[in-house]
Amino acid sequence: IVGGRAAEPHSRPYMVSLQIRGNPGSHFCGGTLIMGWGRLGTREPLPXVLQELNVTVVTAGICFGDSGGPLICNGVAQGVFSFVR
């Protein structure tokens, strides 16, 4: 995340990290990414620190670039999207 800041531990309880039991740090992906860690590609390593930032909500035009992060409204996960028009 460009211009973000490190999130406080446990401040985002709806974010998850899927790992292989007995192999800490071995993140893997399934059919859907449900964590907003800013992955740029399937072969890129995951960052160790979740980041957050404030964004301006737009009501018209095209919004894209989230790449599968969760849609959170008032602290509740409402859905997962990758591209909205």
UniProtKB/Swiss-Prot annotation:
The active site is at S67 (charge relay system). This is Neutrophil elastase 2A. InterPro entries: Peptidase_S1_Elastase_sf, Peptidase_S1_PA, Peptidase_S1_PA_chymotrypsin, Trypsin_dom, TRYPSIN_SER. Belongs to the peptidase S1 family. Elastase subfamily. Gene3D superfamilies: Trypsin-like serine proteases (2.40.10.10). Keywords: Hydrolase, Protease, Serine protease. GO terms for biological process: proteolysis. The lineage of its organism: Eukaryota, Metazoa, Chordata, Craniata, Vertebrata. The keyword Hydrolase applies.
